[in-house]
């Protein structure tokens, strides 16, 4: 039960707009993708490429909810950045024929912020909270009764002037997204009826995404080129599309063409210090640092200090792909370069 400032009276739960400016609920309309490349998201599950098992599970849960005329159970989506957690939240709302209101956990600073969001919901709507692992404790505790019983239990005021109030909420679906599942407290995690991991994408799936996007931007990417781009995209659609945009920039400005080949991709990405493995300068610095330690396990904090980078960034941005391609292994004593990783970094004369 959260304590709310006594400055908010019994009839003053429609919090002022300026007090919620950081977390103002935004209703996401059906996307009109005419010429806006930033709205090139899939708008149906059929258009969403990859994650077939996850889509099948969600489809069953959504159809069952529609059949029972109930909101979908609260859903937790977790996985690496750029895999489609936000897009899936929008698709869930669309399939449930409702609206999706969005917020990011760092912007929900005070209990009154989450109160304002919850009171603004209508029956059956989806509330999407990104980076949900970053909710503070008081805000998180307010969500417990909201998720389980669709009510808010508030203590207003303090000491002898304190009073309790329960406010009923419309039935809604909370969709949480996180890159750090272990950072979510057990009480909050257990209140999600559906919990799904979003996996890395296969090269074939990424190739489809690249081909679709290249048609949207009217660029001719040949089959070999899209396959090459897919292989260096770290299994992540966001990276694939970002690289394609950079290659497009190079093709238009330097080569004056709208035809993309493998050779053009290599030249373009070389100018951005990205090599044929999809590794950038930071990745190669990381591998070089481990290589200098002569097969001695090295702690993450030591690596971060040596590179002048944040340990969290290295752990969640750099390391997953290096592990995925077999260049890095984690041991209880620290990080180790694999034989494959050593062979790669030894072959590099890093003059990017």
Swiss-Prot record:
The region called Head domain (RuvB-H) is annotated at 276-352
Q: Quick one: which residues bind ATP? A: 41, 82, 85-87, 148-150, 191, 201, 238
Quote the EC number: 3.6.4.-
Query: Residue ranges of region Large ATPase domain (RuvB-L)?
Result: 13-201
- Ranges for region Small ATPAse domain (RuvB-S): 202-273
| Record: residues binding Mg(2+) | 86
Which top EC class is given? hydrolase
Keywords of this entry: ATP-binding, Cytoplasm, DNA damage, DNA recombination, DNA repair, DNA-binding, Hydrolase, Nucleotide-binding
Listed under subunit, the entry gives: Homohexamer. Forms an RuvA(8)-RuvB(12)-Holliday junction (HJ) complex. HJ DNA is sandwiched between 2 RuvA tetramers; dsDNA enters through RuvA and exits via RuvB. An RuvB hexamer assembles on each DNA strand where it exits the tetramer. Each RuvB hexamer is contacted by two RuvA subunits (via domain III) on 2 adjacent RuvB subunits; this complex drives branch migration. In the full resolvosome a probable DNA-RuvA(4)-RuvB(12)-RuvC(2) complex forms which resolves the HJ.
Please state which protein family the record places this protein in: Belongs to the RuvB family.
Q: What is known of its domains?
A: Has 3 domains, the large (RuvB-L) and small ATPase (RuvB-S) domains and the C-terminal head (RuvB-H) domain. The head domain binds DNA, while the ATPase domains jointly bind ATP, ADP or are empty depending on the state of the subunit in the translocation cycle. During a single DNA translocation step the structure of each domain remains the same, but their relative positions change.
Protein name as it appears in the record: Holliday junction branch migration complex subunit RuvB
Underlying gene: ruvB
């Amino acid at each position: 039960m959260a304590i709310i400032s006594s400055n908010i009276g019994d009839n003053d739960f429609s919090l002022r707009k300026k007090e919620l400016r950081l977390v103002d609920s935004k209703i996401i309309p059906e996307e009109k993708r005419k010429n806006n490349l930033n709205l090139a998201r899939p708008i149906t599950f059929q258009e969403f490429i990859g994650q077939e098992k996850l889509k099948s599970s969600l489809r069953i849960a959504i159809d069952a909810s529609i059949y029972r005329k109930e909101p979908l159970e609260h859903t937790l989506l977790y996985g690496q950045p750029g895999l489609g957690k936000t897009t899936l939240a929008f698709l869930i709302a669309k399939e449930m024929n409702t609206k999706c209101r969005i917020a990011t956990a760092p912007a929900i600073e005070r209990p009154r912020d989450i109160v304002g969001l919850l009171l603004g919901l209508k029956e059956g709507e989806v509330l999407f909270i990104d980076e949900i692992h970053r909710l503070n404790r008081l805000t998180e505790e307010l969500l417990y009764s909201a998720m389980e019983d669709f009510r808010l239990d508030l203590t207003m005021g303090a000491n002898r002037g304190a009073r309790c109030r329960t406010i009923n909420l419309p039935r809604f679906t909370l969709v949480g997204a996180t890159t750090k599942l272990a950072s979510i407290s057990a009480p909050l995690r257990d209140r999600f009826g559906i919990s799904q991991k979003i996996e890395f994408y296969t090269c074939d799936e990424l190739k489809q995404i690249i081909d679709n996007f290249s048609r949207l931007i009217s660029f001719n990417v040949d089959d070999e080129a899209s396959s090459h781009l897919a292989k260096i995209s770290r299994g992540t659609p966001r990276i694939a599309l970002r690289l394609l945009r950079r290659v497009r920039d190079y093709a238009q400005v330097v080569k004056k063409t709208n035809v993309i080949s493998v050779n053009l991709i290599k030249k373009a990405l070389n100018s951005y210090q990205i090599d044929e493995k999809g590794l950038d300068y930071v990745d190669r610095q990381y591998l070089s640092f481990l290589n200098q330690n002569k097969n001695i396990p090295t702690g993450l904090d030591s690596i971060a200090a040596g590179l002048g980078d944040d340990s969290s960034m290295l752990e969640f941005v750099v390391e997953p792909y290096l592990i995925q391609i077999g260049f890095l292994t984690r041991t209880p004593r620290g990080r180790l370069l694999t034989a494959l990783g050593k062979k790669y970094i030894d072959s590099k004369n890093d003059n990017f």
